[in-house]
């Protein structure tokens, strides 16, 4: 198939070529095309005959944590059978198989744990992860690093006891002052759980207010059956709105990857009119997130094959929205915008701009270079015990950034930060 012909959709249409303003690479285009075929349930995708960026495609898939998905779609392709590509193809196959096997193990381990929690009268809501995976025909190819649970605080004591009895490990806790997020890891089956009492960090000025939008979520929850196990989760409207808000949160940090857009599309296709789209659109408009989601929806329609009309979602403004800058940003950023240290550091500028609701200032530049102790604790755990060593952490951070710059050609965190602040303005998040 010639490179400029694209790949046909099931309805005979083709992915549109990027316009003169588009800046996607050929590798990024092929990733999207293979990904869309996977989401549609196709058996395979064929790369262009003279495709020579196989290594770049593999690296990009790894950056977005969809290595197994892309390999599954192209494993029969002639490009992978070429002698010069044999070593890479073998390595890719090995990694893909390992990822899928680990996901199967993690899913089984989590379902076993969830049933034990239910028997003890503990009913956390499963958010994203397992639920999103279930929307895909080959669910274990859509890997998850963890399972997010939303729990009522009054159930924590029993929840914690059960997990510790099952061999899960966690950090020491002050039971009178529980943190926003409590991670548990089981070294036996590699299940990793992030427990939450709220969906967003309450003290974060840029998005902590989003918690109020989910008041009563437990009262509205539904039950999904996955592999024979009844799983409690958010209602279709709450869950779809949460996926948008979760992506928005990471957009305000250092970004998010294409997989989150895929999950939105798959959830919309699964629940269709069970989602109250009018309620979501009204909330998005009030929160200045409507243009942001219109761009995501346009990405879903033009590049991931989503017919939004069939889901009940109607957006008359979508045609006027330029989704390309957002698409390029999320493709370059990888999962949660973690593609480079410089990009991760830039998060402080976008967060500060969102808090202030305006363009980056000297204070946001300072925040990027020298973030507060609450942010730094996430990267230097010893600050939890020795917060007065914050200046030492700043020095280590700057040296780490300098080392990263020696091995990359990435823009500085300030340049990336300024560019991403402009994205916030473009999508009307800030003035």
Features from the language model and the residues they span:
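Short, Lys/Arg-enriched N-terminal segments with co-localized hydrophobic residues
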Residues: 13-23
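Conserved NTP-donor binding/palm subdomain of two-metal-ion nucleotidyltransferases/polymerases, i.e.
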Residues: 24-145, 151-431
């Amino acid at each position: 198939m010639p490179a400029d012909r694209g790949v046909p959709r099931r309805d005979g249409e083709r992915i549109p070529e990027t316009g003169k303003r588009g800046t996607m690479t050929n590798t990024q285009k092929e990733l999207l095309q293979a990904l869309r075929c996977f989401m549609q349930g196709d058996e395979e995708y064929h790369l262009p005959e003279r495709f020579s960026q196989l290594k770049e495609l593999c690296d990009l898939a790894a950056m977005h944590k969809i290595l197994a998905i892309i390999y599954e779609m192209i494993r029969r392709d002639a490009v992978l059978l070429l002698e010069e590509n044999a070593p890479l193809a073998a390595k890719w196959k090995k990694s893909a198989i390992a990822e899928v096997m680990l996901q199967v193990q993690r899913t089984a381990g989590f379902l076993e744990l969830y049933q034990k929690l239910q028997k003890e009268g503990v009913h956390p809501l499963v958010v994203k992860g397992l639920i999103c995976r279930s929307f895909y025909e080959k669910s274990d190819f859509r890997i998850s690093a963890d399972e997010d649970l939303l729990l009522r605080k009054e159930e924590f004591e029993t929840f914690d006891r059960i997990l510790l009895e099952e061999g899960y490990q966690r950090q020491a806790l002050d039971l009178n002052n529980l943190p926003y997020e409590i991670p548990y890891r089981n070294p036996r089956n590699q299940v990793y759980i992030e427990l939450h009492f709220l969906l967003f960090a309450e003290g974060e000025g840029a998005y902590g207010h989003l918690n109020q939008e989910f008041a009563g979520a437990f009262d509205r929850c539904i039950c999904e059956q996955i592999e024979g196990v009844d799983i409690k989760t958010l209602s279709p409207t709450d869950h779809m709105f949460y996926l948008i808000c979760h992506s928005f949160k990471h957009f305000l940090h250092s970004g998010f990857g294409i997989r989150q857009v895929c999950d939105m599309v798959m959830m919309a296709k699964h629940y269709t009119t069970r989602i109250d789209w009018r309620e979501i659109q009204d909330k998005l408009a009030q929160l200045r997130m409507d243009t942001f989601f219109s761009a995501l929806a346009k990405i879903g329609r033009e590049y991931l094959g989503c017919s939004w009309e069939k889901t009940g979602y109607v957006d008359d403004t979508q045609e006027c929205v330029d989704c390309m800058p957002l698409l390029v940003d999320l493709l370059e950023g990888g999962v949660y915008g973690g593609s480079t240290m410089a990009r991760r550091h830039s998060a402080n500028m976008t967060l500060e701009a969102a808090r202030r609701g305006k363009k980056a200032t000297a204070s946001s530049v300072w925040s990027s270079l020298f973030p507060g102790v609450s942010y730094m604790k996430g990267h230097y755990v010893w600050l939890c015990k020795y917060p007065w060593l914050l200046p030492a952490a700043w020095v280590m951070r700057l040296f780490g950034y300098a080392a990263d710059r020696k091995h990359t050609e990435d823009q500085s965190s300030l340049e990336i930060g300024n560019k991403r602040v402009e994205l916030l303005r473009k999508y009307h998040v800030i003035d």
